[in-house]
Amino acid sequence: MGFLAPLIISVVMLGFAALFAQESRVAAIDTAQAQVQSSGHAFLAYRNAVMTYQQNNPTFTGVVPTAAITAYGGPLSSAFLAQVSNVVVSTGVRNGRVVICYGPFSLSVAEQAALASSNDASFGVSNGTTWTSAAVGAPTAALPLITNIPSGNVVSVIQMDI
């Protein structure tokens, strides 16, 4: 029995090491997924703040200032705000406006923002002068952008007739 004890201890230790390695991988996946969710929710809050500003200032065109976004959108991190931008463009028809928010995030962030807003089809990914919605069941046809947005950026595109 004495010669089996080291073998049994080795097998048990190997089992614990395998279990620990498996748990470490799961935690890493959950951390990455949590970051995507957090970015998706932050992008949704950013878009909502820009939209609130636009609704309160219906003749505005240009880039909504960061100070106004933080006033309407609550606590968004300075690191997040440094990555995102927006533009409000006149359509030239009556008082129409197109509000575009964008940032260099993955498609997963657009999907999370869409899911967090009840599958809002205004979230998607830019292809430069076009964009495609990330909403579940949305048409996959590329839609035109009124201004060029860097390709691969997550976007929220909303057209309003004020």
Which residues does each predicted region cover?
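Broad hydrophobic/π-residue packing in well-ordered secondary structure
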Residues: 4-5, 53-57, 87-89, 99
